[in-house]
Amino acid sequence: MFNLVEKRRWFFIISAFLIIPGVVAMIYSTATTGAPFRLSIDFVGGSIYDLAFAQPGITEGDIRDAFAEYDDRSLTVQRLTLDDGSERWSVRGSFLEQEQRDAIFDNLNEISPLDRERTQVESVSETIGSEVARAAFFAVLAASFIVSFFIIIAFRTVPNALRYGMSAIAAMVHDVLVVMGLASIMGLFFGWEVDALFLTAVLTVLAYSVQDSIVLFDRIRENIPQYLGEPYETIVNRSIWETIHRSLATQLNAFFIMAAILLFGGETIKQFIAILFIGLVSGTYSSIFTAVPLLVAWEKGELPFMSRIGAMLPAPRPTEDNGI
């Protein structure tokens, strides 16, 4: 049986290579734009106008003139040519009241009649955007605490139960950094924006990652009394091989579905599916090759800093119950 846990330092190096480019991209993006990635109006507020005109020949200058009285400094104007050859304009600006938007539409109609059936407007106030961003932060934070508490309680009969919870959180942090780094890199090079769907993808990735970690930890817990006398590292390696087929089978089902959506789905959800796809790959990797090797390294005293933290915290009282 190949000893995966023995190669844990290589797995940690691979994790570093996956995380560091994204962290660098987030630092660069923060230094240049003030945010680690391009934020949609869901988080910063504003308005997006999808404009369609009945007649061609509209220029960017015409559109800027129509907005000049109400929203000129923050305006971003982009011309889009659809597959059928029709022309649309995507305009992004600050949040405006309905009366101001109506006045802008009047200005645009004077230049060229708007196709009202194909013209769309999406607006989010800055207050709502900041509330969504705050809620997103607390949602991820709450998920981390709840998962840690659950694992500590569920594995209370295992020595050093806190280490299981902390290792699962480390895998979650790994996956969040991979997904956030991907969003930052794609935002810098391809203009991807982080919206409310991104938060959905992150929470979904965390759920899959935690599920895999718990399955592995549960098998370790079952094998510890069954293989008394074996080194802890050997028991953990055996547990990985006994559960790896289940982890891969579960994730492959999701991968095939997402791959089909990426190939044949609509453009509006492809970014969400791509983030989810990469996140689930990272979640599968981190559960097997980050959380469990980290647990072994901690148990073997290879993480003195983490050992000192664990010694400062009270250990849960063991019980006779081995169930979750």
State where each predicted segment sits.
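A structural signal for conserved, well-ordered secondary-structure elements
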Residues: 1-324
